[in-house]
Amino acid sequence: LVGTFSDRLNSRFGRRHLLMYAGALPLGIMMFCLFSPPAFLSDSQLVGWLFFSVVGLRLAFTVFQVPWVAFGMELSSDYEERSEIIGWRLVAGWIGGVAFSFGMYTFVFGASEGFPQGQLNPNSYPGFAVITGLLVTSWCFLTAHLTRHEIPYLLRPTEPTNYSLLTMFKQFWSLLFNPFYRKLVISMFFLAIVSSFGGFFDAIMNTFFWGLTGEDLRWFGVAILGAALGIFLAVRLSRYYQKQHIIIAALSINMVLAIVKVSLRFFDWVPENGDPMLVWVLVIQEVLHVIVVSMPMTLFPSMLADLSDHQETRSGERQEGTIGAIVGFAMKLTSSVGLILGGLMLDHFIGMPAGAANAGVPIESDVLFRLAISDGIIASCLLVIPISILATYKMSHADIKEIQNQLRYKRHTNHEL
């Protein structure tokens, strides 16, 4: 709904910025609610509060994120420059994320006498909620405000902007019958499942398998170096190789790195937990991991922008909002599947004991072994699925150039008429 509405919106703020402004404040409020439930709630009321907060957060995020993603697709029609724009956006995101994580682990989740691993201290989360809510709203407003000068240069609907559910479904089905879009989206779906499945275990692994504290985890911010290098490599390599081939190579390397990481512990080839050297071994591994993760993060959105040109030749409309919205909705849905699978694994395969989050609760070695197998072996091997799908994706750089030439000729002809 938001994607189709955004594609057909014709306001003084263009097609995207009005919704970006509208989503900023609710997003910060819902973020605060999620991490700061009232203390007087009963268990059943707490479940209701969390449900309301999560659903509200998802809705507010959709209102902001869908036009924001579409806006990024619109900024350039150049095949290579699209990757550069996405790359710079990711660099800004990584810098902000690293600064945020370092600040939180240093000043909010610092160790205390009762909680040597500060991220397990429940008293830290109200302050975290306030800071996060304010920052999210502020950055959303800034993002919209500082890019408003681009509005006059963006495409607008050339026909009356009739909007209905029928219009939405027509655009939806038009995209689903695009074979290139279908393959790309399905590969992203499975990658989202794998990423959320593996991400579910990251905090658990860092806390219980590797024994890291909040002070240790803040040094993982060094991974920003890997993000910068990965984005640079993605942009440079896309000039010489097909984007899908670069993603396949990056995902394959990522799979190997994850397996090697836990294998080093199995063979006792890394320092023991608590040794300061272990932190830096893991930081180096994280830098390598972020290099290969940031490459698909750069190239997937760039490929979606390329597909918006292909889709225009089929439907006659610019559908960046719908393209991004379908992907965003599916990513939310599939990431939830990954979290559910992770929870089931944690309960029925790993056997994590109840109350493990409380400091001092012992965890048996076989539980930690199954945890490592789930995170390092099972989750990483699932990357074979998106790799296999992307191997069948055949749209090339030359194909995109030809499509863009056709669109330029069509727009020039229509303008003369």
Indicate where each model-derived feature is located.
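Membrane-embedded alpha-helical bundles of multi-pass transporters/translocases
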Residues: L1-L417
